Amino acid sequence: MNKIALFFGILLAAMGASAEAAAPGADKSAASADALTKTVSGLDTELFDAFNHCDTPGELQKHAGYLAKRLEFYHDKGGVTWTRAAYLANTEKNVCGHFRRELVPGSLEIFPIKDFGAIEQGWHKFCDLKTNQCFGEAQFLIVWRHRAGKWEATRIFSYGHRPIASK
């Protein structure tokens, strides 16, 4: 019995020591996750501020600055757009001066992609610029690449579009 008690005592002590050793790394990882969340949520704000004002001179090009040249945009209702240029042409035609995009508060989640960047996902809603009424909502996912100190969206998915129920 004493050997079993001694074994479990050593095992528990080793587990406690390894948990203490892991704690500083966990703090560093949490700080890194917080920094990534702050960075990507800031990118979302900047990207869509330019999107929402794309009828103002220079804002569509500012919006373009966040997008990879070979951007792929997947929209459940509109299909796939294979380049930044095609996406910008569609945005100018269908979005600018018509509606704005709003992030649904509390819906944003950000996940790191090792040696690449991050995934951003959440819910957004769309609101008419003339009436200020929000008419639809959808889920979204953006794949961000971080290369040479610059972040750019390489893939954007907007899906599950549905009307917002009137109250």
Please identify what each model-predicted range represents.
Residues 137-166:
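Short beta-strand edge/turn micro-motifs at domain boundaries
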Residues 38-39, 57-116, 134:
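A solvent-exposed, acidic/Ser-Thr-rich amphipathic alpha-helical stretch
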Residues 69-72, 121-127, 160:
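Generic short beta-strand segments
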Residues 5-15:
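Bacterial N-terminal signal peptides
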Residues 18-69, 164-167:
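Short, low-complexity N-terminal intrinsically disordered segments enriched in polar/charged residues
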Residues 114-124, 138:
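A short hydrophobic beta-strand element
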Residues 110-118, 132, 144-151:
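A short, structured loop/turn motif at beta-sheet edges
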